[in-house]
A protein has these predicted regions:
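SAM-dependent methyltransferase catalytic region
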Residues: 1-133, 143
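Short, ordered loop/turn segments at secondary-structure junctions
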Residues: 136
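Conserved active-site and SAM-binding loop architecture
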Residues: 147-149
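Conserved RecA-like P-loop NTPase helicase motor core
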Residues: 151-156
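Conserved beta strand-loop-helix elements of the APE1-like EEP
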Residues: 157-169
Length: 169
């Protein structure tokens, strides 16, 4: 069997579930919880969603991203509730828990220079030994231009800029 499980990554692992669901779904949930709870995670690769109006508001992931909001003086830090930020924090948590590993995401690039992302950058610098970021730019709102003066275009058909991020511990 290919080790792919149906689960919400941004939810904390739960104790093994009972028979509330059909056996196959219960078995799937139990196996996913075992992976999340007891298996060392050494490499996380993905392209998390960029959703500023996230519906992923579970207590576990919210408590993890609270680290990124600590000591901020801004009145609003909604940008830190974006799903891609939660997935970066999710990956950071598991790599920290393991003591070593690689987190590789293509994501929204606003954390690179966002004012409200200061603590996020600080925590990432404290967690990882090496950080490599390839800023692909492409943010339509910034109206950036290429070195030759042409309009900067996104690699995807989206308004938000993109970066390829590699975090190594």
């Amino acid at each position: 069997r290919l080790k792919i499980y149906l689960t919400n990554s941004l939810e904390e692992s739960h104790p093994d579930t009972g028979t509330l669901f059909a056996n196959w779904l219960s078995s799937e949930a139990n196996e996913a919880n075992f992976i999340k709870r007891d298996t060392p995670v050494m490499c996380i690769v993905g392209n998390p969603p960029y959703a500023s109006s996230s519906t992923n508001k579970g207590k576990w992931i919210e408590s993890l991203t609270a680290d990124y909001k600590k000591d901020l003086k801004e009145k609003s830090y909604n940008s830190l509730s974006d799903d891609y930020v939660k997935f970066i924090r999710f990956g950071q948590y598991f790599i920290d828990k393991n003591g070593s590993g690689i987190l590789a995401y293509i994501s929204n690039n606003s954390f690179i220079d966002g004012i409200t992302h200061r603590q996020m950058r600080k925590h990432l610098l404290e967690s990882f030994d090496k950080i490599y970021i390839l800023d692909l730019h492409g943010n339509a709102k910034k109206k950036e231009v290429c070195l030759d003066g042409s309009v900067d275009q996104n690699v995807f058909d989206i308004m938000q800029g993109v970066s390829i991020n590699l975090f190594v511990k």
